[in-house]
Design a protein with these regions (language model features):
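Single conserved hydrophobic/aromatic residue that forms the stacking wall/gate
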Residues: 1-8, 12-13
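Charged, cofactor-coupling segments
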Residues: 9-10, 79-150
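Short alpha-helix boundary/capping segments
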Residues: 16-17, 118
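Residues forming anionic-ligand binding surfaces in small-molecule and nucleic-acid pockets
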Residues: 17-26
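ATP/adenylate-binding site constellation spanning eukaryotic-like Ser/Thr protein kinases
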Residues: 8, 22, 62, 92
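Active-site cores enriched in adjacent His and Asp/Glu residues with nearby glycine-rich loops
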Residues: 32-70, 85-91, 102-106, 135, ...
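Short, structured beta-strand/loop micro-motifs enriched in basic residues and often containing a Trp
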Residues: 70-79
Length: 150
């Protein structure tokens, strides 16, 4: 239980980051409805994470999913000036907040796959695929354990 952590302990800091990254996903998908704009999801994720002083990764984003795993649109996890596309019923999107305990900057290691924070701070990533509907979005990738806890 996060509320039972010792203040300032590494485990407490880690657990809070993980839970808040997860919650930022749910804050974002409150706006994942047909007729809304993509930036509303992005802004909600970023605003929530930044309210705790976290760095929101800007070099990696969520994406559309269709006949290919990674498709347009790109879905940032931070507030943008542009509104982005209007969401349509039937769209499938991978919403994946990536939040750092420290600065938002990341770098790729020599294997061109592993991503680490530039300041060596802790980082968390939470991802699910959603289906846009006229009402609440449908989360397509929740685990059985997550479904039980909701």
């Amino acid at each position: 239980e996060i509320s039972e952590c010792l203040v300032g302990s590494e485990m407490c800091i880690r657990d809070r980051l993980i839970e808040r990254t997860r919650q930022s996903f749910f804050e974002g998908i409150k706006y994942a409805k047909a007729g809304n704009h993509l930036h509303e999801i992005s802004a909600a994720i970023g605003d929530y994470a930044e309210s705790f002083g976290y760095g929101v990764v800007t070099d990696l984003v969520g994406h559309g999913i269709g006949t290919h795993l990674h498709e347009e649109p790109e879905i940032p996890n931070f507030r943008q000036v542009r509104r982005g596309i209007k969401l349509r019923q039937g769209m499938t999107l991978a919403i994946e907040p990536m939040i750092n305990e420290g600065r938002p900057d990341v770098e790729w290691l020599g294997d061109d796959w592993t991503v680490v924070t530039e300041d060596s701070s802790l980082s968390a990533h939470y991802e699910n695929t959603i289906l846009i509907t006229d009402g609440e979005p449908e989360i397509l990738t929740l685990t059985d354990k997550e479904l039980e806890s909701m």
